[in-house]
């Protein structure tokens, strides 16, 4: 059986961190993929580096995807993914752009692509509840995520989870089952989801 990976895509406050923690609790093979990050803001869950280092990796063909958001630069690098899967781990990637989901999916793993969704009001409540200092920026990103989904409505997903209707534990169990079953991807009713 080939190695597996999980992509969690969704707006801020959709539960990516919480669900990743639940996945690791269910099965220690699941491990958060810590993206490279250059710039200000939160450092937990990232490998802090410089923009120059990200550029160096990109020139060497080792960056699968990079993006800028919240005044910082982020990258998903092939060496770290290879190290995790080589150690028998199941990397869990947090994504905020469908283009990134598509780019990373090119890596030959059995990807389980999960769309996490919650309404704007839930994002606002969760971001305020966890003490985010940039709630307005995160609400702007919620709208960008919604538009990103509408712009890529044909993108197939293994699962679409309404995180305002499920506990993190329930969501993690659904994802774990999808990995165990080798769930494929199918086109979903994105327009109906984000209305």
Show the residue positions of the predicted features.
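Small-molecule kinase domains that catalyze NTP-dependent phosphoryl transfer to phosphate-bearing small molecules
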Residues: 101, 129-180, 186-195
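P-loop (Walker A) phosphate-binding loop of NTP-binding proteins
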Residues: 11
């Amino acid at each position: 059986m080939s190695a597996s990976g999980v992509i969690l895509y969704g707006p801020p406050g959709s539960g990516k961190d919480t669900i990743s923690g639940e996945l690791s609790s269910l099965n220690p093979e699941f491990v958060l993929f810590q993206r490279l990050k250059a710039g200000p803001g939160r450092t937990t869950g990232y490998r802090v580096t410089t923009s120059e280092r990200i550029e160096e990796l990109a020139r060497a063909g080792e960056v699968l995807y990079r993006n800028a958001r919240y005044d910082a630069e982020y990258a998903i690098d092939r060496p770290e993914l290879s190290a995790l899967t080589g150690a028998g781990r199941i990397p869990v990637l947090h994504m905020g752009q469908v283009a990134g989901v598509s780019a990373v999916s090119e890596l030959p793993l059995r990807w389980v692509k999960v769309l996490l969704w919650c309404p704007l009001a839930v994002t606002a409540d969760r971001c305020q509840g966890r003490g985010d200092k940039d709630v307005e920026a995160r609400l702007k990103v919620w709208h960008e995520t919604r538009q990103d989904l509408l712009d890529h409505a044909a993108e197939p997903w293994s699962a679409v989870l309404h995180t305002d209707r499920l506990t993190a534990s329930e969501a993690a169990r659904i994802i774990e089952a999808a990995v165990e079953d080798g769930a494929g991807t199918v086109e979903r009713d994105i327009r109906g989801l984000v209305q």
